[in-house]
């Protein structure tokens, strides 16, 4: 029963568009009643109807330590006692910035903002200001926040301008946004051949987290770095999802590629609203007040967010933190795949440390956006609701990644696998494929 959630959702729709403050939370992609959460602890969520869920959303990525981690709660509580916002610098800004740079050596200087969208938007403005160029390249299926210039669908071909993907985005705003195919270096090279003197930057998720989960091929990222070097453009890694999750040094450390700028968010706030962007010293020095490129924010460097983020990053230095997290992720994903195979369920998966994507498809590997969108969304919807009914909370969208935290133990993972095995064993025939 979800009586209280249903009542709250009905009430919320009177006051908020769709009853939510971020569209995916409304369950529009899966149907049904979104769960209103009352409490979260470790790997669990508890909704207003007192139902407990094993959580694989993790607030969409920030909760790498699990919910209500004692060190993070203590740091936030201590910060709150000293005030909620100063509108002035605080010492923890310096400490967090230094730790970010220690973990990610490509970030020689960093600017704190309030969200991942602010981080990517500001990084692109900086890239344009530094290069004196206007065009950017993004990739079909990669999501970089809701800034106008990034809400773009691919055009009809590699050499066409993008088209707005939302009403309210002026056509003129996106005509400087070029779209290419993720993991297809030739599509990027073609854009450089035509617009070489106009391209300020490439922005890319090194592991794309919003077309389910698709890692970049190593030679693809190497090729992007080489093209940027060749044409004098900047390479921007959007590591809002992957930063400090897939490795202490982010995805850039796994690929051993040094971007010019990096956008961060989620984990660096420990659950508080936060974002950041940083990179090469000479580029970051072009930001106001040192340089001419303007960016500011009333709540940037918020003392509570800085304290929570600093406490979170310190926990990531624990011995075997990432090896343990990777082991749990692999245990979960490989367990799901083996059970799907045994039940003849058409399912594939991609995963990295602490993050995974499940796609209902008979294709063995998914490396492109076109493959991801051809996954069976109806199968996912059925699977999602069966999991939810059995106390497992997945992202309510077939195209969103799942997250696992340090608080998840083999107990939660194995319980999840038992639930999945039962679901697959009794699933409707339309979920099955022939041998």
From Swiss-Prot:
One example of a Gene Ontology biological process annotation: protoporphyrinogen IX biosynthetic process
The keyword Iron is assigned to this record: no
Subunit structure as annotated in this protein's UniProt entry: Homodimer.
Single GO MF annotation: pyridoxal phosphate binding
Cofactor needs: pyridoxal 5'-phosphate
N6-(pyridoxal phosphate)lysine carried by residues: 266
InterPro entries: 4pyrrol_synth_GluAld_NH2Trfase, Aminotrans_3, Aminotrans_3_PPA_site, PyrdxlP-dep_Trfase, PyrdxlP-dep_Trfase_major, PyrdxlP-dep_Trfase_small
Protein name according to UniProt: Glutamate-1-semialdehyde 2,1-aminomutase
């Amino acid at each position: 029963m979800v009586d209280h959630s249903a009542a709250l959702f009905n009430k919320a729709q009177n006051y908020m568009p769709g009853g939510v403050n971020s569209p995916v939370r409304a369950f529009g992609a899966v149907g049904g009643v979104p769960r209103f959460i009352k409490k979260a602890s470790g790997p669990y969520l508890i909704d207003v109807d007192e139902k407990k869920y094993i959580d694989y959303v993790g607030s969409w990525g920030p909760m790498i330590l699990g919910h209500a981690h004692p060190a993070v709660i203590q740091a936030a509580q201590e910060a709150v006692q000293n005030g909620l916002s100063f509108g002035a610098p605080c010492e923890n800004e310096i400490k967090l910035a230094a730790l970010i740079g220690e973990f990610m050596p490509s970030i020689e200087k960093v600017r704190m903002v309030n969200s991942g969208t602010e981080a990517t938007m500001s990084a692109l403005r900086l890239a344009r200001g530094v290069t004196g160029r206007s065009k950017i390249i993004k990739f079909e299926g990669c999501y970089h926040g809701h800034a106008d210039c990034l809400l773009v669908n691919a055009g009809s071909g590699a050499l066409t301008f993008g088209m707005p993907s939302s009403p309210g985005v002026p056509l003129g705003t996106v005509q400087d946004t070029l779209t290419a195919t993720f993991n297809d270096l030739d599509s990027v090279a073609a854009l450089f051949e035509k617009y070489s003197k106009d391209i300020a930057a490439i922005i890319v998720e090194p592991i794309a987290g919003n077309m389910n989960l698709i890692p970049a091929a190593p030679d693809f990222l190497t090729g992007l770095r080489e093209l940027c070097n060749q044409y004098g453009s900047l390479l921007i890694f959007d590591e809002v999802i992957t930063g400090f999750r897939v490795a202490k040094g982010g995805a850039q450390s796994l690929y051993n590629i040094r971007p010019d700028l990096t956008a961060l968010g989620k984990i660096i706030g420990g659950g508080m609203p936060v974002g950041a962007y940083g990179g090469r010293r000479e580029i970051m020095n072009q930001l106001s007040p040192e340089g001419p490129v303007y960016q500011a924010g009333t709540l940037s460097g918020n003392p509570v967010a800085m304290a929570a983020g600093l406490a979170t990053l310190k926990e990531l230095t624990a011995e075997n933190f990432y090896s343990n997290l990777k082991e749990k992720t692999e245990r979960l994903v490989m367990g799901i795949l083996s059970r799907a195979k045994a039940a003849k369920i058409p399912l594939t998966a991609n995963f990295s440390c602490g993050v995974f994507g499940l796609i209902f498809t008979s294709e063995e590997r998914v490396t492109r956006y076109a493959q991801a969108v051809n996954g069976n969304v109806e199968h996912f919807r059925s699977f999602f609701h069966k999991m939810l009914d059995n106390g497992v909370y997945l992202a309510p969208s077939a195209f969103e990644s799942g997250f696992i935290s340090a608080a998840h133990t083999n107990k939660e993972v194995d319980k999840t696998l038992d639930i999945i095995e039962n679901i697959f064993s009794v699933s409707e025939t339309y979920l099955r494929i022939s041998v």
